[in-house]
């Protein structure tokens, strides 16, 4: 890429919206396909100590975000719903005392459909959670067993019904291209999810990630590429036919029900990440900084009790890397983003990367409208090829 230089300090005329990500790293059992920072429960759940550590972590970051309003919060994992509602309440009370949390903030918590967690849903709402994201993956018990999940289809339906009674917004996570899955069995999952009345459905292609059991030994019966593409087309078509807007690579929402937290990621907004292994991105007038917390929960807890600053690594994003990082997020959105947002969020005018933009357009991967960066249908299908234009 052509060498890019920032203007002098003050290149960002305004800071982007700010979100808060909170990582809860424990699960009852780690799934064989999962490459997230999650750890199986072995010796009990150190809830009180971890909440204390999260609040210490947040206090550590206050000078870097002082006075900025927080638009959304997302509890991810791991399985955040393993924590008691009282713990989530204590944490959110601490967050409110430390940050300018917007009155209409979206506050999402990831939950598993086991009956143990369902009993807590009312408590989560009372604590201030406004949206649940339920990790269903499939309603088919055979598929769930192959994926190593600890719930069954009936429990998933009960969890969703309970969530929708309590929350205006609820997401269902589904996976497709599963072992021995056909177009019809994939559609059965999608139609079941649609029938629940969920406002948002995330549909993810099962991938064999390195350093996971499935990555080392893929399960038998995985659909071949062409069959997997047929399944994907059927899944997407069914969701769109039911009135869901396909607004991001894997995300479908009823009108006005998009996940605001994830939209902020994809629009290259800022997010403070706290908790074991959490990543963050914070903009300053003269630079953009990425952060990552110590990954293992035991190490994170120990450092937060003794030397909190040593639990955090900080790195300024090189100016020449910013266009790719911006596009890597923005081009996941079906409608793309306004072209002016590149300069607003990175300080780099589009003119600096016009050669790369023109290459993407000539390949038919990026629309030619100069006011927007929007992938074509071909660009959405071959997103990696589109992103390669900006490397």
Where does each model-flagged region fall?
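Short, amphipathic alpha-helical interaction segments positioned at domain boundaries
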Residues: 380-391
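C-terminal scaffold of the Radical SAM
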Residues: 4, 10-19, 38-64, 68-348
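Short amphipathic alpha-helical interaction segments
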Residues: 347-359
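Basic, amphipathic "hinge/linker" alpha-helix immediately C-terminal to the N-terminal HTH DNA-binding motif
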Residues: 373-380
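Local cysteine-cluster metal-coordination motifs and their immediate loop/turn environment
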Residues: 25-38
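Short, Lys/Arg-rich nucleic-acid/phosphate-binding segment
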Residues: 252, 370-373
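A short, conserved structural fragment
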Residues: 362-371
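Short active-site neighborhood of thiol/selenol oxidoreductases, capturing the structured segment around
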Residues: 20-24
């Amino acid at each position: 890429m052509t060498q890019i230089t920032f203007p002098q300090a003050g290149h960002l005329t305004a800071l982007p919206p700010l979100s808060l990500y909170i990582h809860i790293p424990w699960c009852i059992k780690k799934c064989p396909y999962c490459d997230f920072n999650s750890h199986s429960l072995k010796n009990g759940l150190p809830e009180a100590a971890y909440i204390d550590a999260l609040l210490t972590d947040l206090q550590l970051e206050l000078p870097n975000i002082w006075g900025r309003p927080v638009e959304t919060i997302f509890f991810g994992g791991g399985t955040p719903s393993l924590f008691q509602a009282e713990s989530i309440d204590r944490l959110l009370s601490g967050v409110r005392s430390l940050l300018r949390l917007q009155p209409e903030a979206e506050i999402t918590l990831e939950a598993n459909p086991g009956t143990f967690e369902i009993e807590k849903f009312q408590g989560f709402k009372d604590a201030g959670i406004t949206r649940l994201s339920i990790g269903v993956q499939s309603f088919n018990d055979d598929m769930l067993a192959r994926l190593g999940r600890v719930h069954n289809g009936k429990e998933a339906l009960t969890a969703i019904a309970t969530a929708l009674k309590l929350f205006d917004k609820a997401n269902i996570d589904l996976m497709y291209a599963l072992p021995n899955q056909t177009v019809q069995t994939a559609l059965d999952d999608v139609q079941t999810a649609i029938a629940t009345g969920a406002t948002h459905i995330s549909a993810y292609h099962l991938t064999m990630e390195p350093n996971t059991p499935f990555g080392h030994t893929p399960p038998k019966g995985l659909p071949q590429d062409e069959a997997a593409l047929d399944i994907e087309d059927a899944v997407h078509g069914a969701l769109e036919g039911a009135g869901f807007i396909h607004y991001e690579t894997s995300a479908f929402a009823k009108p006005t029900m998009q996940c605001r937290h994830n939209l902020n990621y994809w629009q290259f907004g800022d997010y403070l990440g706290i908790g074991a292994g959490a990543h963050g991105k914070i903009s300053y007038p003269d630079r953009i900084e990425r952060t990552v917390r110590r990954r293992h929960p035991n190490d994170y807890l120990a450092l937060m009790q003794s030397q909190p600053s040593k639990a955090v690594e900080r790195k300024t994003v090189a100016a020449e890397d910013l266009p790719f990082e911006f596009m890597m997020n923005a081009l996941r959105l079906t409608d793309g983003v306004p072209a002016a947002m590149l300069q607003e969020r990175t300080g780099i005018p589009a003119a600096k990367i016009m050669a790369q933009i023109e290459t993407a357009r000539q390949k038919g991967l990026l629309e030619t409208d100069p006011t927007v960066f929007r992938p074509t249908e071909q660009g959405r299908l071959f997103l990696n090829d589109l992103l390669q234009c900006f490397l």
